[in-house]
């Protein structure tokens, strides 16, 4: 069987046609998988052969149909910054969207759902409520101290509203425009990590964006904890602080070093 790979308008991709993704200087592309230990989805194997049939088609031959159709989460490096409102997309369920565009509505929808204990923030004894809303609050405070979040759906307008507050200041909840980009950039990462299905793949680009070094280390720690809880986390990063956060999480929590893979390009 042959299956078409969509190169554009999926997961934020705009790759053009197959001519644009061919390796220059190579007449033949051969993809081989040797001693594969990283599983993408449980109970699925994916031996693949790439066949370039012409400059406009890319085909996959093998057992890869629907490989990313379920239990796959992806956050682009160019996530949405501060917004007062986000449109409610009724077609999207349990996904923040490629750019985090569904984050506010999703958070409001799942706020009372329970979080698996392995993913709960437990570094401080008084932060033990295991709902998604509270766990988002705890982890956000760990990465960007003092931030409180309020969300609401305005259903007749089909929009979701978010307001933010700095707990140390007596200002009340304000527009996200009054705060830095780091909050809006990291919130979909936290929410996705907490709701991702066990065994699913979570791919996130540049989780360090708009965070100071300590925050970068802490988001690395968070993602490592989500991996230890059963989510397969794939990170693209330029930050040594993110990597150090992963190392700290592994050291403190007895993570098997063989479960961590760092590739330098």
Regions found by a protein language model. Give the residues of each.
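Switch/communication elements of ASCE P-loop NTPase nucleotide-binding domains
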Residues: 1-6, 146-148, 152-265
């Amino acid at each position: 069987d042959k299956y078409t790979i969509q190169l554009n308008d999926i997961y934020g991709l705009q790759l053009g046609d197959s001519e644009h993704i061919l390796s220059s200087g190579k007449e033949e592309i051969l993809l081989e998988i040797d001693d594969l230990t990283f599983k993408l989805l449980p109970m699925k194997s994916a031996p693949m052969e790439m066949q370039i049939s012409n400059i406009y088609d890319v085909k996959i031959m093998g057992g890869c149909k629907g490989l990313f159709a379920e239990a796959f989460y992806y956050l682009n490096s160019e996530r949405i910054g501060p917004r007062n409102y986000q449109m409610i997309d009724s077609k999207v369920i349990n996904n923040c969207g490629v750019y985090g565009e569904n984050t506010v509505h999703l958070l409001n929808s799942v706020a009372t759902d329970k979080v698996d204990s392995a993913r709960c923030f437990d570094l401080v004894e008084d932060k033990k409520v295991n709902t998604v809303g509270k766990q988002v609050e705890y982890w956000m405070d760990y990465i960007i101290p003092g931030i409180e979040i309020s969300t609401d759906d305005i259903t007749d307008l089909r929009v979701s509203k978010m307001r933010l507050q700095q707990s140390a200041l007596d200002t009340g909840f304000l527009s996200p425009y009054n705060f830095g980009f780091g909050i809006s950039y990291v919130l979909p990462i936290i929410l996705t990590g907490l709701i991702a299905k066990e065994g699913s793949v979570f791919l996130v680009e540049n989780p360090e964006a708009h965070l100071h070094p300590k925050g970068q280390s802490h988001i690395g720690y968070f993602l490592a904890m989500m991996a230890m809880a059963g989510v397969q986390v794939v990170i693209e990063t330029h930050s040594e602080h993110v990597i150090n956060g992963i190392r700290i999480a592994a050291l403190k929590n007895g993570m098997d070093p063989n479960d961590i893979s760092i590739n330098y390009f």
